[in-house]
C-alpha cells in the first residue's frame, strides 16, 4: 500500500520517538526526507542521520535524536503544506516560527532550506513544516 504523505509520516515518526525517549528513528528513505533530516541536523535539532541500503533497491533513513537535560530538543514538529492543500509563499511572506526561535523548512527551486536561508537567497517556495 502506498503512503499518502511520506513527509508527514517522517515527521510523526520523529515526534513519537522523541515523546517516548527513543534514541533513533528509522523510516523509508527518499531524497526529500534526507534533505529535511540534513536541515534538522544543520540546525542542531538532531544529532546524526544515516542512509542504509536494503534489498530490492530500497534504502532506510536512520535519524539519531538529540536530547537536552532529558527532554527532546524538538518540542514542536508540525506539517504545514500537505498533499491536499499545498502552501506556497513568496520571499516576503515566509513565516517566522516562534518569532525566529524556531525554523520553517522550505522547498525552493534552489533546494530544501530553512526560512532564514530562503530569505537570504531571495527565494520563496513550498512551506513543508515548522520546527521549534
Swiss-Prot record:
Phylogenetic classification of the source organism: Bacteria, Pseudomonadati, Pseudomonadota, Gammaproteobacteria, Lysobacterales
InterPro entries xref list: Ribosomal_uS8, Ribosomal_uS8_CS, Ribosomal_uS8_sf
Role: One of the primary rRNA binding proteins, it binds directly to 16S rRNA central domain where it helps coordinate assembly of the platform of the 30S subunit.
Assembly, per entry: Part of the 30S ribosomal subunit. Contacts proteins S5 and S12.
UniProt keywords, alphabetically: Ribonucleoprotein, Ribosomal protein, RNA-binding, rRNA-binding
Leader sequence segment: none
Designated name of the protein: Small ribosomal subunit protein uS8
Stored Pfam families: Ribosomal_S8
Any coiled-coil regions, as ranges: none
Source species of the chain: Stenotrophomonas maltophilia (strain R551-3)
Amino acid at each position: 500500500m502506498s503512503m499518502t504523505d511520506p513527509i508527514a509520516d517522517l515527521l510523526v515518526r520523529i515526534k513519537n520517538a522523541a515523546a517516548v525517549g527513543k534514541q533513533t528513528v528509522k523510516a523509508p528513505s527518499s531524497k526529500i526526507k534526507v534533505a529535511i533530516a540534513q536541515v534538522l541536523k544543520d540546525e542542531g535539532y538532531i544529532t546524526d542521520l544515516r542512509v542504509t541500503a536494503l534489498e530490492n533497491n530500497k534504502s532506510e533513513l536512520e535519524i539519531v535524536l538529540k536530547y537536552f537535560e532529558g527532554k527532546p530538543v524538538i518540542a514542536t514538529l508540525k506539517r504545514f503544506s500537505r498533499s491536499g492543500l499545498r502552501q506556497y509563499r513568496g520571499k516576503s511572506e515566509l513565516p517566522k516560527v516562534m518569532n525566529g526561535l524556531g525554523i520553517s523548512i522550505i522547498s525552493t527551486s534552489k533546494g530544501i532550506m530553512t526560512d532564514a536561508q530562503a530569505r537570504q537567497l531571495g527565494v520563496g517556495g513550498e512551506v513543508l513544516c515548522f520546527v521549534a
